[in-house]
Amino acid sequence: MTIPEKPQGVIWTDAQWQSIYATGQDVLVAAAAGSGKTAVLVERIIQKILRDGIDVDRLLVVTFTNLSAREMKHRVDQRIQEASIADPANAHLKNQRIKIHQAQISTLHSFCLKLIQQHYDVLNIDPNFRTSSEAENILLLEQTIDEVIEQHYDILDPAFIELTEQLSSDRSDDQFRMIIKQLYFFSVANPNPTNWLDQLVTPYEEEAQQAQLIQLLTDLSKVFITAAYDALNKAYDLFSMMDGVDKHLAVIEDERRLMGRVLEGGFIDIPYLTDHEFGARLPNVTAKIKEANEMMVDALEDAKLQYKKYKSLIDKVKNDYFSREADDLKADMQQLAPRVKYLARIVKDVMSEFNRKKRSKNILDFSDYEHFALQILTNEDGSPSEIAESYRQHFQEILVDEYQDTNRVQEKILSCIKTGDEHNGNLFMVGDVKQSIYKFRQADPSLFIEKYQRFTIDGDGTGRRIDLSQNFRSRKEVLSTTNYIFKHMMDEQVGEVKYDEAAQLYYGAPYDESDHPVNLKVLVEADQEHSDLTGSEQEAHFIVEQVKDILEHQKVYDMKTGSYRSATYKDIVILERSFGQARNLQQAFKNEDIPFHVNSREGYFEQTEVRLVLSFLRAIDNPLQDIYLVGLMRSVIYQFKEDELAQIRILSPNDDYFYQSIVNYINDEAADAILVDKLKMFLSDIQSYQQYSKDHPVYQLIDKFYNDHYVIQYFSGLIGGRGRRANLYGLFNKAIEFENSSFRGLYQFIRFIDELIERGKDFGEENVVGPNDNVVRMMTIHSSKGLEFPFVIYSGLSKDFNKRDLKQPVILNQQFGLGMDYFDVDKEMAFPSLASVAYKAVAEKELVSEEMRLVYVALTRAKEQLYLIGRVKNDKSLLELEQLSISGEHIAVNERLTSPNPFHLIYSILSKHQSASIPDDLKFEKDIAQVEDSSRPNVNISIIYFEDVSTETILDNNEYRSVNQLETMQNGNEDVKAQIKHQLDYQYPYVNDTKKPSKQSVSELKRQYETEESGTSYERVRQYRIGFSTYERPKFLSEQGKRKANEIGTLMHTVMQHLPFKKERISEVELHQYIDGLIDKHIIEADAKKDIRMDEIMTFINSELYSIIAEAEQVYRELPFVVNQALVDQLPQGDEDVSIIQGMIDLIFVKDGVHYFVDYKTDAFNRRRGMTDEEIGTQLKNKYKIQMKYYQNTLQTILNKEVKGYLYFFKFGTLQL
């Protein structure tokens, strides 16, 4: 169908217009970052409805996430409603408003689930199936692998024995089990998993495939050997310019002769390479040689570096690719074939048994969704089924978003329900292969690349390709820098796609013309003499300074109004490859009081509150685990002190378990009686919880622990209380989810948690920060995909690529299969096989390619300005970086494949042709926009030494002044003088705050307000606070005289803390028995009973308030809290006083869903003549109004609910607030 002519004045670019209307064949839209692909996709759907009259439920729209699906459906629904309002008589539009709710705009998994629900009879499964949780799936798969391995241990096939000896250790078979698990996940990402597993052995048996692998390694070796020869020749040329280096030249001449033989005839002579030694040692560069070439010091160093580079490149070929002769590599393949075949058999057994278990439990996982859908849509010969044909008739177009993240199974499903071939099909695909960063989820970017290379711009004879290259997100400096980097870094060899004119980004956003250069910051670490911080901590502190600089100096441009506003916290994001730097950043931002949030799915199990609950669960499951038992004892719940634990252990130093030591201590006559009682209560708790866990699910056990010990309340009152509370509820909810699976019990739940921790999986800290909250954010590049921020700080660039998987004994690859090292069982030695070497080389190339794509995603998140943060150890590392500058179109393939981290790649590109002669002892700034080559982007490269970075002042351009500018300052600059005077005259605006303590009790706040109202200075209250003693009165003073009033008050509060609330009021006799019990338990002293005002307590027991509490649903006693005063005072943003309130609430109860607090008062007061009870009550309320206000606001802040309160005076009665 012909694309309609684009009218004048429409907002769409030509490429977007084509993307909206192109039809009649399969269409692939290569949509670069920020090119408006979502808007185009929505507009295409709308035009299908409005222009072509297609019903919305006859379109299948596939998105990558459920969130994307909801957002897209919402956008489409809005547009339909707008069109319907504009044309109310249009019956077709009215129908669409109804049909939008049945429209298939979803993830492919959701579509597959719907397919299964409608056609379960084809699969012969129970229609009442449910989807298994991740917990259930992990445990069931682990259980299946264990059982299958045990079965094969019974068989003891020779190939199985060899496998276990190769892949297991003397202590465990964890590695063997992990490989089986990985193979399972790789296999089910294919349309026919069994067939994929069967083909794993083919390269080990067929010589033709082995020859292909040899050729692959030979071609790759040629790249490195050619680069090595170039480096060798450069070293020779440099040494030839010098005096006194004849011996050096002789060594290099010999190496050149050897290399010439290897490269003779344009081919790589691998046998000659493996048979001879290369890289002879160069003679030392003596002081005499340096003196003779004193004018060529840099050239001398460069010559040595070039020879070092030559050696490293040759070593890589000889060590990584051809450490053994090709014939030996082939011979090992034949011996490995039975092991590979048997390993595939084990995985097939796991797959079969795992499927059987899932069917018996009537559960499905996400892999089942895809494979069952494929089973419904295909016949046994792989051709589309009748059901597939019906879907082909129903769906008039299939639209796929994020096509670059599709896998082979999903591709097969789409091919079953699409119509026609590529030249006349109805499949519309949108994506950007440069943003394919989900290979760990088995995404296969080659599907996109194959179509991109096959489809044409005009679509003649095949599918149509449309390039959306105009970026509407970023300033031109961000785009030109991104283009410049990737023009030199990415091509088909490394990166898997050519970054040419069609792939690059074109400026399309309506920004003004102001200058916003990209900033590349190179941080040189301070050594231990200059800083106690690690390199990572130094980088974190430096990032904070960059944030402060942005907040003070940068503005955000509003495209709609054409005006600027000040930068805020939420405008800034810090992107990293992983969350490894999160803790350092959190601490650094905390030190500067900058609101900061880590958008993390990691670190959950490291949170204090979560570790406490897990220690509790582990101790209940098995108290013989010392770490968890002692951890629970030392926690805020039980509060055993270190010296108490020492006493216990000293008495039984040879016990195997601390639990045994506790029991022995309790039974020892010489033991401290108070500690024995404390231990008895602790063991009683443990035994009680153990008994409870036998009859109740895990989530109820956790809930009981929370309620018994006020865990939620305690952690809610700490700094970060909202997040801590969310974490605790998150663990509770996970326990509920776990209990809803087919697994039960505390042991299984702990096993599940251990499995997640071992695999590096996290629930993630519960997110309590919304998208509009004004905080600086840190997130991984993966989680930032699809988002945009005015200011992006891309840090962690110097962190090395994670190549851990390349060191495993088994390398997996979707295209090639399985590469296994050869293990000589007799010699117990492992050797690289042809397959393991070749697949490792392929995996390394794919890994670096994906890391490049991650860099692309990170750079293209920035709207206003981009900051790139690299870090080097010292000046020597900086000098080596300078040597990386390139002069060609691309960085050499070998340089890219061996680059340790993104920073090496980025710096080598952006520092191209830059002078390395600036003195190292000066901070400097190199603006590569000033270089004559006009194609260069606008980038500032700054070298910063950490010891020069002040963590108290903001780094600005003054930190990088040239020598001339410094001289001008010395001669006297009026601006500088004015600045100095301004700083000396500066008056600190918050002087009063320096006189206030950072932490105050509620009682102190009450005194503060009372003194302010009476005209007394706060300093006197502060002096009172400092002088007030909280230590207990020594026994010798207690024994000599009566208790003081405040001590009696404390005693009365202690009695009330433990007082039972019964619907049938306790009698005076029972009260005496209860107090005797407190004495027996050493809660109060033996002589305290005489000072307890029994009559006043009985008056309370007979009061209405006692009855109300006795009938309450929940009662909590003596609740401590710590809360930010700004939150309690509900201060506006920016007026927050950094002051913490701490206190203790006597009692809280919940009745009819409402929370009430009670505060007991032992005050003595004089009843003035003629004063009524009402007047006395008003006077008492006024006296404590400040304190009660803080209690009420604190609880409302913590609970997020309305709270009411009571004051109870033992000498007056009840006052309701």
Curated annotation (Swiss-Prot):
UniProt GO BP: double-strand break repair via homologous recombination
Annotated residues for binding of ATP: 31-38
CDD domains linked: DEXQc_UvrD
Record keywords, A-Z: ATP-binding, DNA damage, DNA repair, DNA-binding, Exonuclease, Helicase, Hydrolase, Isomerase, Nuclease, Nucleotide-binding
GO molecular-function term, one example from the UniProt record: ATP hydrolysis activity
Cofactor: Mg(2+)
Claim: Coiled coil is one of the keywords in the record: no
Segments forming domain UvrD-like helicase C-terminal: 476-786
Nuclease is among the record's keywords: yes
The UvrD-like helicase ATP-binding domain, residue ranges: 10-475
GO terms for cellular component: cytosol; DNA helicase complex
InterPro entries: AddA, DNA_helicase_UvrD-like_C, DNA_helicase_UvrD/REP, P-loop_NTPase, PDDEXK-like_dom_sf, PDDEXK_AddAB-type, Restrct_endonuc-II-like, UvrD-like_ATP-bd
EC number(s) recorded for this UniProt protein: 3.1.-.-, 5.6.2.4
Pfam families listed in its UniProt record: PDDEXK_1, UvrD-helicase, UvrD_C
Annotated SUPFAM superfamilies: P-loop containing nucleoside triphosphate hydrolases (SSF52540), Restriction endonuclease-like (SSF52980)
Catalytic activity entry: Couples ATP hydrolysis with the unwinding of duplex DNA by translocating in the 3'-5' direction; ATP + H2O = ADP + phosphate + H(+)
Function: The heterodimer acts as both an ATP-dependent DNA helicase and an ATP-dependent, dual-direction single-stranded exonuclease. Recognizes the chi site generating a DNA molecule suitable for the initiation of homologous recombination. The AddA nuclease domain is required for chi fragment generation; this subunit has the helicase and 3' -> 5' nuclease activities.
Family: Belongs to the helicase family. AddA subfamily.
Self-association state and partner proteins as the record states: Heterodimer of AddA and AddB/RexB.
Name assigned to this protein: ATP-dependent helicase/nuclease subunit A
Organism the protein comes from: Staphylococcus aureus (strain JH9)
